[in-house]
Amino acid sequence: MANSERTFIAIKPDGVQRGLIGEIIKRFEQKGFRLVAMKFMRASEDLLKEHYIDLKDRPFFAGLVKYMHSGPVVAMVWEGLNVVKTGRVMLGETNPADSKPGTIRGDFCIQVGRNIIHGSDSVESAEKEIALWFHPEELVNYKSCAQNWIYE
């Protein structure tokens, strides 16, 4: 598929605890994106500090790392045409109060500190985040039989 890209999506501890893993995966699959990697894990503080390094000078940084380390997360890599941009639209705004109904955050979240999901904000960020969370051999390349029904 031409112009295919990959994005990093992580279901945060609140999304895991609330039993939303299946619903989130379902939405990405139903859209037509292809899951190429997934881990259910408790992220180390070092991994989280590196992941959120751009926010290290913000007053909420320590609390964010502590919260993300408080329970398991589901780290995923999704692939498809415009998956970074479309994935961000599917997630909704960072602040759930600004998210439209029909988005993941608009349907399932109330407060910004418990917004259940992370998604890469650019192709460059996605590449960096995927390399941080996954080894190359953990990314599975395959052709989905549905691909011909999703793309021209």
From Swiss-Prot:
EC number of the protein: 2.7.4.6
Keyword field: ATP-binding, Cell membrane, Cytoplasm, Differentiation, Endocytosis, Kinase, Magnesium, Membrane, Metal-binding, Neurogenesis, Nucleotide metabolism, Nucleotide-binding, Nucleus, Transferase
Disulfide bond entries: none
GO molecular function ontology, one term from the record: metal ion binding
Obligatory cofactor(s): Mg(2+)
Pfam families: NDK
Positions of the catalytic residues: 118 (pros-phosphohistidine intermediate)
Catalytic reactions of this protein: a 2'-deoxyribonucleoside 5'-diphosphate + ATP = a 2'-deoxyribonucleoside 5'-triphosphate + ADP; a ribonucleoside 5'-diphosphate + ATP = a ribonucleoside 5'-triphosphate + ADP
Residues noted as binding ATP in the record, renumbered to the chain: 12, 60, 88, 94, 105, 115
Activity regulation statement: Autophosphorylation at His-118 increases serine/threonine protein kinase activity of the enzyme. Interaction with the SET complex inhibits exonuclease activity.
Subunit (UniProt): Homohexamer.
Record-stated family: Belongs to the NDK family.
UniProt protein name: Nucleoside diphosphate kinase A 1
Organism: Bos taurus
Gene: NME1-1
